[in-house]
Every structure is written in C-alpha cells, then in structure tokens.
Amino acid sequence: MPAESKAAVRLAIGHVLFIDIVGYSRLMIGEQSDLLGVLNDAVREAGEFRSAEADGRLMRLPTGDGMALVFRDSPEQPVRCALEISQALKNYPKLQVRMGIHSGPVNEVADVNERANIAGAGINIAQRVMDCADAGHILLSKHVAEDLQHYLEWRPYLHDVGQCEVKHEEIISIVNFYTK
C-alpha cells in the first residue's frame, strides 16, 4: 500500500459553490472558450472570491464547463459569491449558468498532476444540488438553508423547492435562493 494511502485523512468542512455553464457541450469550441473566459473573469472579480483567496481560504477546481469553489470559513461565503457572479453575468445574456451550494466534509488530495485538489461529500452534494437547477438558478442544500435561516438578512430569500432525485437515485432536499 502506498505511503500516501496510509496517511490519516484530514477532514474539514467546505462551503462549496458549484457553477456550470448551461448548454456548454452544444456550443462551438470558440464560443465555449469565450463564455468560459467571461465566467472566469466574473468569478475573479467577485469580492467574496478575492477576499477568500487573499486569505488563503479558498480552493478552485475547474470542471471544464464551470468550476467548484470551496470556501473554508462560512456558508455565507459561497452565497455572497454566487450573488456577485449572478449580478456580473446580467450583462452577458448568452452566458447562462446554474449554481449549487452545499456545506459538507471535504479532504485535500493530490490530483493526477500531483497538485493540491479537494474531494469528498461536500463537493459531490454541491454538484448534485446544482444538477437540480435550471439556468439562472442558485439552489442551496437544505443543510445550508437551515444554517442561513437563523439570520434575518437571508431568510426572505430562501424558498423551499422540495426534493429532487439525483444520481444513484438519491433524494436531496433543495431550497431556491431568490432575490429580485
């Protein structure tokens, strides 16, 4: 067994924002590149992203047609970041994204290129939450919504959607995060 496998897995809670460009695979390669560039710019310009990155409390994972952003401090961070990105993308109607947010266990791993990466249920469930979304939606796991509902600032924007069947016939409870 390799030495890395014997090392104790250090689990942490990650607050994950998963973002996907809707219809990406149907686009021409040039369009894919252009839209991914616009999305990357919007993400890098988001204040919550820049703040967490400057503090060394953010991990970025490209997914080909989007990304996962793993914040380390608070479930509010991915929500604020999603709002900032959504606002920035209003200027680009051709770029339709969907977003999913979940807080859960994650652990750092080395990827095939031996670079730091992150894995775990926190990432997986955030992606499943996002998979339930349509273009323009920001969906939260029920877990994140329950954390946020204790704050007056967030409560008016939380709208229970119910349950969604995702990969492996798993059922998850989701909440739509909606502002005007």
Model-derived regions: residue spans:
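Catalytic beta-strand-to-alpha-helix segment of the class III nucleotidyl cyclase homology domain
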Residues: 44, 48, 68-179
